[in-house]
């Protein structure tokens, strides 16, 4: 407990003499909450005083002389974030739909932005809905080129989760045709990639400051994960890759602290092609990622990154439930876990999130319902085990998007509750207008809550012909 002492000195002067009255009052005040005591730093401040010359009191009319000691408290810096146990629950339910183009009749600042590659990242107090825009809105006159992956107009934008990404709601963070973001507990880190295919550049922004860059190392479309990076104790880990979409593309991880790259991590193992990883914490020691191989296999490359040693290894998932699209029939690939099988050309980013429990861990995945097209989205789960060696099928856990609706990229993220983390999966539902009209997306969100079965799928409600 800290005593707060107030001393007051009052000096009274009269024409007949000097009357000195000294009053000292000491009182103890006790802080009611010990955590406040621990978090706040005391700082002493002393008021300036005037000197008093009493040699000739007859010349003094009236003087007040006081000295005050004041105790102030400085607000503490926010804490770095660490993964916690997941909030209780045994099933995912439909949480939210963000379908901007249901409001497509709006014009001007209320018009929805044309976007793709949405993802969500959360800090201790808020979640942000990110996307890559084509710097165009619907309705509007700039639809040409909105189906392109990379051009000079694309930007990383965000809105607070639950807001519609319109012109007036959106914050434009940086020029980018590939992106990521994460919160370390104190501040946001934003990642954007743009530039020519042969010499693209990663740019890092920490809060409002642009802080660092990273250059292409294979001169073939340097790109990042299109979902949230992951932070622990102030260190944030970002997956990047550089290489052919139909050949070798070796990934790396960047360790970033307060917006600056402090280490490069070069994974070992099955490294031929790894891109668009969806990553999360299996524990305080390990980040795991389910990734995309666009060249050789319909199995997902699975990364384990040790944050204590800053080492990473990649192997293919062994499950007979193949998670990429296009893909062969489940269980049809023979041989060891590292066998590629057929129908490995092409692919899609997949959703993946952890459910951390005291006695076990759940790994939740998403994949399209169609084996050949980006249609529908189903949820799967596997408790415990090792994705590198377990060949058993994943357990289906419900339909999030029916076969009649588009199911494109999907991603994982976690919402911070007061004492636990809520795992969620988001789904990009693309309005594919081809090259003749606008090309944009809605976002469906499913989160762990309660028990029972996943009850309802999501529709965008958008008719592009209107």
Curated annotation (Swiss-Prot):
Residues 38-86 are annotated as: Hypervariable stalk region. GO terms for molecular function: exo-alpha-sialidase activity; metal ion binding. The active site is at residues 149, 409. Residues 35-466 are virion surface. Disulfide bonds join 87-420, 122-127, 182-229, 231-236, 277-291, 279-289, 318-337, 424-447. N-glycosylated. Ca(2+) binds at residues 293, 324. Glycans are attached at residues 56, 64, 144, 284. One of its GO terms (cellular component) is virion membrane. Homotetramer. Intact N-terminus is essential for virion morphogenesis. Possesses two apical sorting signals, one in the ectodomain, which is likely to be a glycan, and the other in the transmembrane domain. The transmembrane domain also plays a role in lipid raft association. This is Neuraminidase. The lineage of its organism: Viruses, Riboviria, Orthornavirae, Negarnaviricota, Polyploviricotina.
């Amino acid at each position: 407990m800290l005593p707060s002492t107030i001393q007051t000195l009052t000096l009274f002067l009269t024409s007949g003499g000097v009357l000195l009255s000294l009053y000292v009052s000491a009182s103890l005040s006790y802080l009611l909450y010990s955590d406040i005591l621990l978090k706040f730093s005391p700082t002493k401040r002393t008021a300036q005083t005037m000197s008093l010359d009493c040699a000739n009191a007859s010349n003094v009319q009236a003087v007040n002389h006081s000295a005050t000691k004041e105790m102030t408290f400085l607000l503490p810096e926010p804490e770095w974030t660490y993964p916690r146990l997941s909030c209780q629950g045994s099933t995912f339910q439909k949480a939210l739909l963000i379908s901007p183009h249901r409001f497509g009749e709006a014009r001007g600042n209320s018009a929805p932005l044309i976007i793709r590659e949405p993802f969500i990242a959360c800090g201790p107090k808020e979640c942000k809905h990110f996307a890559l825009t084509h710097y165009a809105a619907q309705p509007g006159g700039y639809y040409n080129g909105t189906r392109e992956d990379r051009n000079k107009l694309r930007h990383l934008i965000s809105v607070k989760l639950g807001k519609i990404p319109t012109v007036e709601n959106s914050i434009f963070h940086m020029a980018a045709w590939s992106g990521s973001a994460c919160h370390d507990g104190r501040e946001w880190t934003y990642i954007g990639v743009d530039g020519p295919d042969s010499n693209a550049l990663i740019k890092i922004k920490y809060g409002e400051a642009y802080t660092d860059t990273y250059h292409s190392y294979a001169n073939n479309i340097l790109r990042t994960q299109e979902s949230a990076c992951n932070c622990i104790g102030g260190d944030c880990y970002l997956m990047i890759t550089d290489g052919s979409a139909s050949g070798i593309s070796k990934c790396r991880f960047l360790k970033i602290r307060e917006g600056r790259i402090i280490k490069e991590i070069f994974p070992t193992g099955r490294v031929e092609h790894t891109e668009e990883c969806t990553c999360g914490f299996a524990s305080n020691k390990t980040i795991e990622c389910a990734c995309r191989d666009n060249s050789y296999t319909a199995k997902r490359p699975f990364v384990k990154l040790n944050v204590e040693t800053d080492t990473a290894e990649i192997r293919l998932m062994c499950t007979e439930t193949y998670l990429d699209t296009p893909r062969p029939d489940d269980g049809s690939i023979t041989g060891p876990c590292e066998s590629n099988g057929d129908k490995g050309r092409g692919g899609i980013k997949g959703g993946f999130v952890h459910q951390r429990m005291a006695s076990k861990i759940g790994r939740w995945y998403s994949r399209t319902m169609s084996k050949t097209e980006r249609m529908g989205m189903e949820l799967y789960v596997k408790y415990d085990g090792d994705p590198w060696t377990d060949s058993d099928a994943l357990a289906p856990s419900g339909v999030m998007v029916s076969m009649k609706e588009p199911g494109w990229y999907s991603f994982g993220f976690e919402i911070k509750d007061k004492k636990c983390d809520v795992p969620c999966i988001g789904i990009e539902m693309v309005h594919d207008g081809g090259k003749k009209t606008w090309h944009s997306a809605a976002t469906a969100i499913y989160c762990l809550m309660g028990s029972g079965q996943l009850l309802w799928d999501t529709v965008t409600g958008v008719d592009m012909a209107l």
